């Protein structure tokens, strides 16, 4: 069996304790990637690290609140030192709250902005100096809500439109600087993760994720497969964004 083209690379993953971030961390480990796992919940991170060890790859965990700039900078620096550099950055951390623009809570808006936008930008800028001169890959988790605005999620959509803008903006900055580091994003529709529970927390609907939406959802592992596809493309190819939704999702 031929070794994976990702073998022996180092990846920093935010939001690695659950959902899509967790699935990506485990998929990368299966391909021989050493990982730095960043999230808020230590017990969850330890569980992901234990699963990673079973593949023979190493993982280090960092409990961090990405809304805290200094804490984030320290975590990224320590992760890069522990790994011996960063080849891949996966910005998978995110918060989804159904907080409207006309009647939403300011604290909800601030939480989404701090994690989805400022946290992502802060992790990226502190990780970049640790990338190899030959170039690495930054992959941001966006959303279908970064392409169209759902009726009750205007502010969340605004943060995901911002992720798309930052993805393209950073890509252009790096090209102008002569860097070959690729920058891309994935924009999923509904994925079967606890993020949906948070998104619907402000409603009276307490049914299951499936019953709430009414059709089979994407699985985190399916998003991880798309991540692997992007990361293993030839160095001369760069997919800027992938839109993926459940087959039954109309919009």
Enumerate the language-model features and the residues they cover.
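Substrate-binding pocket helix/loop in short-chain dehydrogenase/reductase
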Residues: 100-101, 105-111
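The beta1-alpha1 cofactor-binding region of Rossmann-like NAD(H)/NADP(H)-dependent oxidoreductases
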Residues: 43, 63-74, 106
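C-terminal helical subdomain
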Residues: 181, 185-186, 205-251
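Active-site helix of classical SDR
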Residues: 124, 159
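Residue(s) in the substrate-gating loop at a strand-loop-helix junction
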Residues: 143
């Amino acid at each position: 069996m031929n070794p994976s083209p990702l073998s022996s690379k180092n990846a920093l993953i935010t939001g690695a304790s659950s959902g899509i971030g967790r699935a990506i961390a485990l998929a990368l480990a299966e391909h021989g990637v050493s990982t730095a796992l960043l999230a808020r919940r230590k017990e969850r991170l330890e569980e992901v690290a234990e699963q990673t060890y079973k593949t023979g790859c190493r993982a280090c965990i960092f409990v961090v609140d990405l809304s805290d700039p200094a804490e984030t900078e320290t975590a990224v620096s320590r992760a890069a030192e522990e790994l011996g550099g960063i080849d891949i950055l996966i910005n998978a951390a995110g918060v989804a709250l159904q907080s409207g623009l006309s009647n939403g809570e300011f604290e909800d808006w601030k939480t989404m902005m701090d994690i989805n936008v400022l946290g992502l930008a802060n992790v990226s800028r502190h990780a970049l100096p640790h990338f190899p001169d030959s170039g690495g890959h930054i992959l941001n988790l966006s959303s279908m809500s970064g392409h169209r605005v759902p009726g009750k999620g205007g502010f969340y959509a605004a943060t995901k439109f911002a992720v798309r803008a930052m993805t393209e903006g950073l890509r252009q900055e790096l090209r102008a600087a002569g860097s070959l580091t690729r920058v891309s994003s994935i924009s999923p529709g509904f994925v079967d993760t606890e993020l949906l529970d948070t998104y619907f927390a402000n409603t009276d609907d307490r049914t299951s994720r499936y019953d709430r939406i009414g059709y089979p959802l994407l699985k985190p592992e399916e998003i991880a497969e798309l991540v692997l596809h992007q990361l293993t493309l030839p160095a001369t190819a760069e997919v800027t964004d992938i839109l993926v939704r459940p087959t039954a999702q109309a919009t």
